């Protein structure tokens, strides 16, 4: 079955301060953040990959830029966070697991190559960077078996930070949908993951990609760092 990929692109991206949706931010190589994500997905998983983009803010711009994928509309994009965007996408997903990306992650396709076997084997995971633990970033800790037991911006004694590339297996998906539904409107999707871990013991593995290129673009400095990869 073709892989299902969701890109979360509904938010307003106010911190970067651009007049367009953040995923359409141009990179130094001439592509947008969103375009490089889609090209990486197609390169690694083939043209049959089923890509859905969750849209909201200035959705027409994204629809025009990417007419060959499907779309999910979060009409409450200005009142809700990523928990509700992901919830909408998972509810209309097909059977099998779902890989999802934050719409502001610039990364090398080698990241997808590293995780492809886990996706085929339907093992839920969160990609992490253990070389940095930013105060503003979503951080994690693990239990004695190396499975994630905490995932939020408030985590103490964190082992690293999440980079915005994640996978939920088909068997775990219903639990995540239930807990995303239970999240507050302003929760990040990571809260839904935490609740699914706490309530159902869902096993989410951290996959270390510290040695590979991946940057989540929140501020101009992040964009500069992302662009340095293309120079």
Report the location of each language-model feature.
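Conserved N-terminal catalytic core of the sugar/cofactor nucleotidyltransferase
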Residues: 2-4, 31-98
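Short beta-strand/turn micro-motifs composed of small residues
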Residues: 9, 28, 55, 102, ...
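A structural signal for short hydrophobic beta-strand segments in well-ordered beta-sheet cores
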Residues: 24, 140-142, 206
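Conserved core of the sugar-phosphate nucleotidyltransferase
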Residues: 108-183
